[in-house]
């Protein structure tokens, strides 16, 4: 494969091998070298999404990668986003806009159509930037998904880009993963692979050298880097809920998040996970909600079915008891809708048409509608006995919520948002990302009962995480082998 500076694709032997983080780090490394770079992922399947300035929806990981590249995220960085809404179906978002719900078989046939906008978006980025760092999805060796592939080698062949393959040694079997993945590719695809990266290594590299030599001899491909395990790295997870927490302080606020079946944008809770004064606990199916200070009902892609799920777990009764004992409850997006009096879906947007009774803690009613509300926004937050503080975030929801606006705790640039209820013990808002601002996070935690809040700077933590990854790549990867034309920039 002829190396080029115009694009490089990162594929992985498995999901969660480290593709997203590697792309993030490479974007920051290139920016440091004065190279104008953009991230790209042709197809992403995730319920964690971000909103672009022009009101489009993309995968959250691509928004973080854009931050690493020091540019504003656009819909062209993730032209196809699949948001699962059932076990066999998903909402299809193309270049930022939802176009349809499809089951897996229906979408498989539709892939030939979406390759058009995928290549259009990729071309737009190539025209604007010196290079594009592309992230694959899952593994390129999934035999059942190879037909009409738009996410891995199908895209790489169409766009004619070189590929590196990353594997996670912490899972075990790294040589089988890399050798087997390469062996399952076609000859032309194998020729496209320029090398391997081994991720999350712990221990003495000398103990690995014989295996590296064997892999290079058997495949004819170089190992371009062995990356160490980065303990405590605080970057958003693409899909799986990250439960890793920082070391706790003496004074703590206990926060519980019930995990819904279609929970979305759980990255909302990353600032709480990183907060030294917060003990954050995710409660799953079959688990009771323990005694706590604050319960936060998260967003969900399927509000009515997840409301039914919440009741099936008995969480509604446990929330009721929690409030009787003086605790606080917060709902974000779909969680906010659940806290109201009713949720109607007359057009069957999320499944069977009908109406569900809400939990009844807020004087609101929600009607689900085909048109999604997608926007970045800023405003102020004022909770009881708390000062008014600036807030920013984004909205992603299909519902229109109506009700009393006189006690809306959030005042946005285009109007009021949210509501307070039950003696100011319940707070609902549509605003995702609300905990990312230090002052807003302080206000919410103080309202929930934490005294002397000491909220860390989440934006700074994310920047430090990105820089830490980039520092690691500069130390442990043979970056000059990826871009020979820029080799002088990577001289050590």
UniProtKB/Swiss-Prot annotation:
GO biological process: cobalamin biosynthetic process
Active-site feature positions: 333 (nucleophile), 432
Domain GATase cobBQ-type, residue spans: 252-440
Single GO term (MF): catalytic activity
Keyword line: Cobalamin biosynthesis, Glutamine amidotransferase
Pfam families tied to this protein: CbiA, GATase_3
Pathway: Cofactor biosynthesis; adenosylcobalamin biosynthesis
NCBIfam families the record matches: cobQ, PRK00784.1
Family designation: Belongs to the CobB/CobQ family. CobQ subfamily.
Role noted for this protein: Catalyzes amidations at positions B, D, E, and G on adenosylcobyrinic A,C-diamide. NH(2) groups are provided by glutamine, and one molecule of ATP is hydrogenolyzed for each amidation.
Listed name of the protein: Cobyric acid synthase
Organism of origin: Photobacterium profundum (strain SS9)
């Amino acid at each position: 494969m002829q190396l080029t500076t115009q694009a490089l694709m990162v594929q992985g032997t498995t999901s969660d091998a480290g593709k997203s983080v590697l792309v993030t780090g490479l974007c920051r490394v290139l920016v440091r070298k004065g190279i104008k770079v953009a991230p790209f992922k042709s197809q992403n399947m995730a319920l964690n999404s971000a909103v672009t300035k022009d009101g489009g929806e993309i995968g959250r990981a691509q928004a973080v990668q854009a931050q690493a590249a020091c540019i504003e995220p656009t819909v062209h960085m993730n032209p196809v986003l699949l948001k699962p809404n059932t076990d066999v179906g998903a909402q299809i978002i193309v270049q930022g806009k939802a176009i349809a719900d499809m089951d897996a078989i229906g979408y498989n046939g539709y892939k030939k159509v979406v390759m058009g906008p995928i290549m259009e978006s990729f071309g737009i980025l190539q025209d604007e930037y010196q290079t594009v760092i592309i992230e694959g999805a899952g593994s390129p060796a999934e035999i059942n998904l190879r037909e009409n592939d738009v996410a891995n080698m199908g895209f790489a062949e169409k766009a004619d880009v070189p590929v590196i393959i990353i594997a996670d040694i912490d899972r075990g079997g790294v040589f089988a993963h890399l050798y087997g993945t390469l062996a399952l590719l076609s000859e032309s695809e194998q020729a496209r692979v320029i090398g391997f990266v081994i991720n999350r290594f712990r221990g003495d590299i000398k103990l690995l050298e014989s295996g590296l030599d064997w892999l290079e001899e058997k495949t004819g491909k170089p190992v371009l880097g062995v990356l160490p395990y980065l303990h405590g790295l605080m970057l958003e997870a693409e899909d799986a809920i990250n439960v890793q927490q920082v070391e706790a302080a003496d004074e703590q606020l206990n926060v519980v998040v019930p995990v819904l079946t279609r929970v979305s944008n759980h990255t909302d809770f990353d600032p709480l996970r990183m907060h030294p004064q917060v003990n954050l606990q995710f409660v799953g199916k079959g688990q009771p909600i323990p005694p706590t200070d604050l319960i936060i009902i998260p967003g969900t892609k399927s509000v009515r079915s997840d409301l039914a799920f919440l009741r099936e777990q008995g969480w509604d009764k446990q929330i009721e008891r929690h409030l009787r004992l003086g605790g606080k409850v917060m709902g974000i997006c779909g969680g906010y809708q659940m806290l109201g009096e009713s949720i109607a879906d007359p057009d069957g947007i999320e499944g069977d048409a009908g109406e569900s009774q809400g939990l009844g803690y807020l004087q609101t009613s929600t009607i689900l509608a085909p048109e999604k509300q997608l926007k970045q926004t800023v405003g102020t937050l004022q909770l009881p006995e708390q000062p008014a503080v600036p807030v920013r975030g984004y909205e992603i929801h299909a519902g229109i919520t109506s009700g009393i606006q006189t006690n809306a705790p959030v005042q946005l640039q285009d109007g009021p948002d949210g509501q307070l209820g039950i003696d100011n013990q319940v707070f609902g808002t549509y605003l995702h990302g609300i905990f990312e601002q230090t002052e807003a996070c302080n206000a919410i935690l103080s309202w929930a009962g934490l005294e002397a809040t000491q909220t860390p700077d989440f934006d700074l933590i994310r920047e430090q995480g990105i820089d830490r990854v980039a520092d690691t790549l500069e130390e442990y990867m043979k970056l000059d082998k990826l871009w020979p034309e820029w080799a002088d920039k990577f001289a050590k």
